[in-house]
Amino acid sequence: MSNANFNRGPAYGLSAEVKNKLAQKYDPQTERQLRVWIEGATGRRIGDNFMDGLKDGVILCELINKLQPGSVQKVNDPVQNWHKLENIGNFLRAIKHYGVKPHDIFEANDLFENTNHTQVQSTLIALASQAKTKGNNVGLGVKYAEKQQRRFQPEKLREGRNIIGLQMGTNKFASQQGMTAYGTRRHLYDPKLGTDQPLDQATISLQMGTNKGASQAGMTAPGTKRQIFEPSLGMERCDTNIIGLQMGSNKGASQQGMTVYGLPRQVYDPKYCDAPGLLGEDGLNHSFYNSQ
C-alpha cells in the first residue's frame, strides 16, 4: 500500500485557512522540550523532523511502555503504512488507559497525514502531565491535583441546608422573627402604646399612617340604605324622605297637590275662565273648582 493512498492533497479555501490557523498555534519551544523528554525516556533519537520521527508510532509505543510497562504488547516494524497506523492506534489506546482524558487525545490521521500537529503536541503535553502526577521525573507539563474525597453523615448534610453561604449576601444580623407566610392575616399595632398583643384587625400600626382620632363608627357597607337628616335642626332619624342640608334646600316648598307620574293634568287660569268642565258617566257637564 503506497503512501499516496494515505496522504492528502493540498488544501484550498476554508480548509487551507483552518490548517494555517492550527499551524500558527504550534509552539517550537514546546517541541524542543518534548524532544528532550522523549529521547531521554526511550533512549532513541527522533531525528531532525520531530513529527516525521514519530509518524511510524514505534517511539510512541516505546514511550508508553517506559511509563507503564506492558501497555503495548507488540510493536510492529514500520514496513507498510497500516503497520504505522496500528502502532499509532495502540499508543492512543494505551495512553487512554494510562489516564489521559479522551478530549486531549489526537486522532491517528492528525499525525500520520500531518493534518493537526498542534493537537499531537497537546496530547504529548497531557501525557507528560499525567506521568508527572504519577511520580515520574518529568520536566514538562503540570502536576494534576489529586482527588480529595470526603464523606459526611446524612445528619451533617441536613444541617447544612440551614446555613446561608456568604455568596448569597449578608443580612447584617437581621432575622425573620415575626414574619408571616404569604396570605396570612397581619395584626398591626403600635408597641409604643403598651399593647403586648394586637387588639383586633381594625388596629393599624403607626407605620401605616394616622387617622387623627377618626373612626369608622356609623359607616355602612357598600349598597346599604343611608338615613340622611340634619342633626343641628333637632331632627331625629325619621324616614328616608328627609334630605340633609348638605344636599341643598327647597326653600319651604312641598309636594302638596302633586300627582303621581302618568296622570293627566288640567291646566287653566281661574282669572279668565271658569273651571273646566268634564263629562261624567251620566253624560252631563260637571264643573270642578279648586278648594282653597
Curated annotation (Swiss-Prot):
<dbReference type="Pfam" id="PF00402">
    <property type="entry name" value="Calponin"/>
</dbReference>
<dbReference type="InterPro" id="IPR050606">
    <property type="entry name" value="Calponin-like"/>
</dbReference>
<feature type="modified residue" description="Phosphothreonine; by ROCK2">
    <location>
        <position position="170"/>
    </location>
</feature>
<dbReference type="GO" id="GO:0005516">
    <property type="term" value="F:calmodulin binding"/>
</dbReference>
<feature type="region of interest" description="Calmodulin-binding">
    <location>
        <begin position="185"/>
        <end position="193"/>
    </location>
</feature>
<feature type="modified residue" description="Phosphothreonine; by PKC and CaMK2">
    <location>
        <position position="184"/>
    </location>
</feature>
<dbReference type="InterPro" id="IPR036872">
    <property type="entry name" value="CH_dom_sf"/>
</dbReference>
<feature type="domain" description="Calponin-homology (CH)">
    <location>
        <begin position="28"/>
        <end position="131"/>
    </location>
</feature>
<feature type="repeat" description="Calponin-like 1">
    <location>
        <begin position="164"/>
        <end position="189"/>
    </location>
</feature>
<feature type="modified residue" description="Phosphothreonine; by ROCK2">
    <location>
        <position position="259"/>
    </location>
</feature>
<keyword id="KW-0677">Repeat</keyword>
<feature type="modified residue" description="Phosphoserine; by PKC, CaMK2 and ROCK2">
    <location>
        <position position="175"/>
    </location>
</feature>
<dbReference type="Pfam" id="PF00307">
    <property type="entry name" value="CH"/>
</dbReference>
<dbReference type="GO" id="GO:0031032">
    <property type="term" value="P:actomyosin structure organization"/>
</dbReference>
<dbReference type="GO" id="GO:0015629">
    <property type="term" value="C:actin cytoskeleton"/>
</dbReference>
<comment type="similarity">
    <text>Belongs to the calponin family.</text>
</comment>
<keyword id="KW-0112">Calmodulin-binding</keyword>
<feature type="repeat" description="Calponin-like 3">
    <location>
        <begin position="243"/>
        <end position="268"/>
    </location>
</feature>
<dbReference type="InterPro" id="IPR003096">
    <property type="entry name" value="SM22_calponin"/>
</dbReference>
<keyword id="KW-0597">Phosphoprotein</keyword>
<feature type="modified residue" description="Phosphothreonine; by ROCK2">
    <location>
        <position position="184"/>
    </location>
</feature>
<comment type="function">
    <text>Thin filament-associated protein that is implicated in the regulation and modulation of smooth muscle contraction. It is capable of binding to actin, calmodulin and tropomyosin. The interaction of calponin with actin inhibits the actomyosin Mg-ATPase activity.</text>
</comment>
<dbReference type="InterPro" id="IPR001997">
    <property type="entry name" value="Calponin/LIMCH1"/>
</dbReference>
<feature type="modified residue" description="Phosphothreonine; by ROCK2">
    <location>
        <position position="180"/>
    </location>
</feature>
<feature type="repeat" description="Calponin-like 2">
    <location>
        <begin position="204"/>
        <end position="229"/>
    </location>
</feature>
<protein>
    <recommendedName>
        <fullName>Calponin-1</fullName>
    </recommendedName>
</protein>
<dbReference type="InterPro" id="IPR001715">
    <property type="entry name" value="CH_dom"/>
</dbReference>
<dbReference type="GO" id="GO:0007015">
    <property type="term" value="P:actin filament organization"/>
</dbReference>
<keyword id="KW-0009">Actin-binding</keyword>
<dbReference type="GO" id="GO:0051015">
    <property type="term" value="F:actin filament binding"/>
</dbReference>
<dbReference type="InterPro" id="IPR000557">
    <property type="entry name" value="Calponin_repeat"/>
</dbReference>
